[in-house]
């Protein structure tokens, strides 16, 4: 202490001596500037000018000034601030700072700042204090706090003083984190206590939130703690599952399986187990399971219960209700999946069983159940043959397979030709006509005796040209709808009674649908057998029927010819033409279809026009072709020509023409008149009533029958006019005029209503005249 005081005294004396000593020579400021400039030019002196250029300083002195600033600022100086303080360019300051840090190992140049060891020791002490307070610090936090690079802080500050000034340790998993041993012990105690208190699965995030421990520390200390549980993963949604809970889960699963021999995935998932199948495999490594979509069945339940019951069902030829042997909480989908899986895994033949809504039927049981359907198929096949349904199906099928019928021809055959329709109406035709020769359009009458068709009002010959001009397009096949002889409803009726006894009537439709196609095919096969077994018998019956039919029509034509010959020549010509177009056309159709059948040709529609018959004749065998074509041509000639042509066709068909028996003519005429009178009594339409009345009066007066359409009514009334008295003629003429008035008037108009009222009043008189008129009345009139 004394030596220091002596040194101070010595320095004070030197300072006083310097102040009292005078210089030998004083220089002016200008001289000083010139001297310094000269020294600089001769590079004998190096100085650093200030920013304003008024002052200069040597580099060594500037270096001392920088070190002084570092000391003044506590060991950390920003070079920018030093540059401002010393008024020296920043670049000169940076160069000197680099030299200082290079020459002095205790000084560091970091991001434009000079930092000495004193400052580093100071912040190390601060870091230690913070570590003591918080127990854990990270380099990133320190870098933010001290505004220093993280690498500098970690290597030159923390790691350098770790264990010396900084009392802590570095995290092995994260080198940028440091903590104290006391902090680690506190965290370990928190984690151990929290995990010990948990009895059910809980998210790790919840645990960390409750105890205030960081996730990385939790996972790093978890293995050291050895908790009574396990963490599912280290992901964000990881859970901690205590061993006590896992044991409880295992106990519940084992108990449930022991009692029920199956496990539900949903029930296991409710226990907190996400992958139920994996858990079952892990929990029961030595057990075999049948894994379904919703449940896992144990091998004991499958082998001893289900498989055994199925074998018994097959042996006894009965059915098995799976719902009675499987757990009650299984759905229908689960039960069906059990059956399907067993069939696949146990190598059973699925064809031995039929599964329907939880019920497994053996094939023998179902075969016995539907046995009565064999008789049903037999009866349906016979009915199809007797009714001609199967024959029609064969025709359509053959036609579709050939594919040689044009589209337009199919359309033509599907449409009813106007002329053919008129020829199939009642022979009395339509009512109308009058003394003035006006035509009237009315409805047709009904058929007369022996099935002869009556005709409608024949409009004109243009219909013939239009019908004959219809042509066909290209060939096309037409799909044929499969014939259903046995339907599902038929089978349901037969099996419902047997199923009701077992309480299974709700499955009748499902079972019937399984066998509908089988029995329908059986019925079709049986129908084919019947069809093939009776062709000759059917052919003989068809030959006889056609022969009788043609002879009947020829007799009708002969009788009608007698009646039409009573008219003038021009009217006769029209009546002959109409007669041939109706009854003659019908004869041609009958013979053409018969010949087509003999030649094994298929015809879809039996109502043929002239063109269609000609095309059909071209396809027939040569022995029939010429006769059929000639008969078609004769329709436009006389009745005698047509009869001769028809006889030729009959001979080619080996049919006999019956001899004329004139004794029966009067009976036929009387029978025809009775038919017309019956129709008249049932008729309420004025136009048709007048038509029938005219035909009846003609037959009564002439003793002949007449085949005429509605347009000939006026000619008929004119012909019988002389056989009636004035009142009768006036009645018929007045009635005829009223009919025309109704047809020409607007429907529901006053004129139409008034005319209908008059017609209604006169109707009984016209009916009475037609019904009661006799030859005696003719004599009285004369």
UniProtKB/Swiss-Prot annotation:
GO terms for biological process: protein ufmylation; response to endoplasmic reticulum stress; reticulophagy. Signal peptide: none annotated. One of its GO terms (cellular component) is endoplasmic reticulum membrane. Keywords: Transferase, Ubl conjugation pathway. InterPro entries: Ufl1, Ufl1-like_C, Ufl1_dom, Ufl1_N. The keyword Transcription regulation does not apply. It is an enzyme of class 2 (transferase). Pfam families: E3_UFM1_ligase (PF09743), UFL1 (PF23659), UFL1_C (PF25041). Coiled coil: none annotated. It comes from the Eukaryota. Its EC number is 2.3.2.-. One of its GO terms (molecular function) is UFM1 ligase activity. Disruption phenotype: RNAi-mediated knockdown is lethal. RNAi-mediated knockdown in adult neuronal tissue results in reduced adult lifespan and progressive locomoter defects due to neurodegeneration, when in combination with knockdown of Uba5; brains show evidence of increased ER stress. Neuronal cells in these adults display defects in autophagy. Residues 404-478 are annotated as: Disordered. Belongs to the UFL1 family. E3 UFM1-protein ligase that mediates ufmylation of target proteins. This is E3 UFM1-protein ligase 1 homolog. It comes from Drosophila melanogaster (Fruit fly).
């Amino acid at each position: 202490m004394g030596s220091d005081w002596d040194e101070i005294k010595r320095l004070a004396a030197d300072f006083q001596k310097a102040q009292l000593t005078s210089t030998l020579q004083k220089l002016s400021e200008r001289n000083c500037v010139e001297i310094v400039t000269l020294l600089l030019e001769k590079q004998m002196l190096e100085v650093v000018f200030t920013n304003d250029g008024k002052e200069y300083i040597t580099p060594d002195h500037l270096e001392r000034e920088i070190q002084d600033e570092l000391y003044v600022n506590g060991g950390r100086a920003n070079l920018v601030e030093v540059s401002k303080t010393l008024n020296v360019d920043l670049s000169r300051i940076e160069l000197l700072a680099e030299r200082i840090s290079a020459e002095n190992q205790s000084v560091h140049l970091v991001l434009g700042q000079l930092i000495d060891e004193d400052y580093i020791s100071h912040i190390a002490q601060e870091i230690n204090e913070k570590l003591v307070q918080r127990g854990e610090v990270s380099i990133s936090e320190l870098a933010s706090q001290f505004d220093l690079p993280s690498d500098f802080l970690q290597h030159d500050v923390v790691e350098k003083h770790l264990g010396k000034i900084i009392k802590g340790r570095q995290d092995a998993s994260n080198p940028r984190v440091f903590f104290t041993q006391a902090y680690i012990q506190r965290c370990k105690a928190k984690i151990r206590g929290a995990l010990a208190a948990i009895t059910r699965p809980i998210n790790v995030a919840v645990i960390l939130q409750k105890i205030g421990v960081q996730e990385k520390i939790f996972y790093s200390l978890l293995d050291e703690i050895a908790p009574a549980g396990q963490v599912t993963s280290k992901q964000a949604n990881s859970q901690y599952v205590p061993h006590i809970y896992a044991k409880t889960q295992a106990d519940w699963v084992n108990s449930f399986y022991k009692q029920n021999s199956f496990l539900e995935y949903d029930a296991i998932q409710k226990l907190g187990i996400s992958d139920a199948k994996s858990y079952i495999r892990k929990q029961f490594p030595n057990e075999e399971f049948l894994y379904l979509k919703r449940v896992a069945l144990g091998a004991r339940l499958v082998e001893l219960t289900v498989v055994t019951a199925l074998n018994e069902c097959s042996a006894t030829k009965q059915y098995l209700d799976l719902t009675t042997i499987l757990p009650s909480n299984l759905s229908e989908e689960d039960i069906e999946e059990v059956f399907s899986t067993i069939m696949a895994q146990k190598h059973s033949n699925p064809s031995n069983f039929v599964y329907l809504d939880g019920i497994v039927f053996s094939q023998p049981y179902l075969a016995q159940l539907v046995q009565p359907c064999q008789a049903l198929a037999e009866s349906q096949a016979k009915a199809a043959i007797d009714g001609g349904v199967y024959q029609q199906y064969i025709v359509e099928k053959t036609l579709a397979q050939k594919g040689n019928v044009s589209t337009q021809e199919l359309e033509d055959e599907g449409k009813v030709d106007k002329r053919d329709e008129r020829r199939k109406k009642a022979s009395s035709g339509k009512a109308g006509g009058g003394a003035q020769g006006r035509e009237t359009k009315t409805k047709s009458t009904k058929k007369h005796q022996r099935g002869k068709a009556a005709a409608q009002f024949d409009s004109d010959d243009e219909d013939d040209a239009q019908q004959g001009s219809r042509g066909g397009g290209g060939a096309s096949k037409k799909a044929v709808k499969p014939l259903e002889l046995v339907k599902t409803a038929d089978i349901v009726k037969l099996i419902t009674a047997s199923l009701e006894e077992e309480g299974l009537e709700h499955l009748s439709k499902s079972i019937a649908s399984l066998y509908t196609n089988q029995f329908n095919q059986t019925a079709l096969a049986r129908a084919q057998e019947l069809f093939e077994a009776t062709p000759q018998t059917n052919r003989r019956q068809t030959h006889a029927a056609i022969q009788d039919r043609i002879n009947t029509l020829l007799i009708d034509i002969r009788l009608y010819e007698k009646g039409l010959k009573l008219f003038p020549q021009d009217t006769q010509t029209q009546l002959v033409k109409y007669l041939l177009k109706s009854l003659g056309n019908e004869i041609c159709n009958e013979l053409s279809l018969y010949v087509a059948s003999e030649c094994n040709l298929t015809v879809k529609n039996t109502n043929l026009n002239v063109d269609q018959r000609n095309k059909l004749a071209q396809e027939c065998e040569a022995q029939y072709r010429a006769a059929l074509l000639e008969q078609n041509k004769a329709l436009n000639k006389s009745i005698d020509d047509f009869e001769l042509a028809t006889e030729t066709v009959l001979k080619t068909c080996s049919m006999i023409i019956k001899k004329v028996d004139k004794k029966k003519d009067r009976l036929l005429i009387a029978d025809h008149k009775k038919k017309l009178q019956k129709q008249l009594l049932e008729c309420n339409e004025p136009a048709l009533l007048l038509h029938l009345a005219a035909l009846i009066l003609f037959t009564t007066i002439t003793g002949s029958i007449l085949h005429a359409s509605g347009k000939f009514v006026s000619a008929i009334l004119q012909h019988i006019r002389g056989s009636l008295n004035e009142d009768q003629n006036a009645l018929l003429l007045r009635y005829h005029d009223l009919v025309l008035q109704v047809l020409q008037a607007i429907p529901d108009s006053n004129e139409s209503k008034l005319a209908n009222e008059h017609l209604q009043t006169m109707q009984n008189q016209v009916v009475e005249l037609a019904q009661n008129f006799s030859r005696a009345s003719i004599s009285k009139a004369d």
